[in-house]
């Protein structure tokens, strides 16, 4: 079993598979290309393209830690752990945070909440995400389908009861 992202449909890109062609009879061209790329990665045993570090990605990674440090102690940072679907080996994800539950009476435990922290580089995007999320889940799904489907995918992979988007933008003073 592999421990890396290549050769899998990842939670962060799973939204591509929700797109249909104009006739709504098949996957969109973009989805078909994604499926082909994952197939190539499986054949090659490596990623097709080298992952590039961009300024917005570096910002998000840096600020995500700050956001985590502001959250209650129940949250566990798990973003370095890649999870795989138990039946679909080509489906994986790496959620940012989880909150576990333990029911001592019934002797069961699991994941209550799975969370993804979004720290947009742009304040405009930050405000757009907050506005959409405050409006409704459907508005967030419509405006930010990649974020929405990433949460859904990670909820399935973890078995979490709830999925939570945490949108964070530091103050200038921070």
PLM features per residue range, with description:
Residues 48-81, 85-86, 147-148:
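Nucleic-acid endo/exonuclease domains
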Residues 74-95, 99-174:
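Nucleic-acid nuclease catalytic cores
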Residues 1-62, 70, 132-141:
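Charged, glycine-rich intrinsically disordered N-terminal tails and low-complexity linkers that flank
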């Amino acid at each position: 079993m592999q421990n890396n992202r290549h050769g899998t449909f990842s939670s962060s890109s799973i939204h591509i598979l929700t797109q249909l062609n104009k006739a709504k009879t098949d996957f969109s061209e973009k989805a078909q290309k994604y499926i082909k790329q994952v197939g190539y990665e499986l054949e090659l045993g490596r990623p097709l393209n080298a992952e590039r570090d961009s300024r917005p990605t570096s910002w998000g990674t840096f600020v995500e830690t700050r956001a985590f440090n502001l959250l209650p102690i129940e949250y566990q940072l798990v973003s370095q752990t890649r999870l795989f679907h138990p039946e679909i080996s080509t489906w994986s994800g790496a959620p940012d945070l989880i909150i576990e539950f333990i029911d001592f009476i019934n002797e069961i435990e699991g994941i209550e909440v799975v969370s993804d922290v979004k720290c947009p580089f742009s304040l405009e995007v930050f405000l757009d995400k907050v506005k959409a999320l405050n409006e409704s889940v459907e508005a967030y799904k419509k405006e930010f389908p990649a974020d929405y489907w990433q949460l859904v995918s990670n909820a399935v992979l973890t078995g979490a009861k709830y999925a939570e988007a945490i949108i964070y933008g530091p103050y200038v003073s921070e």
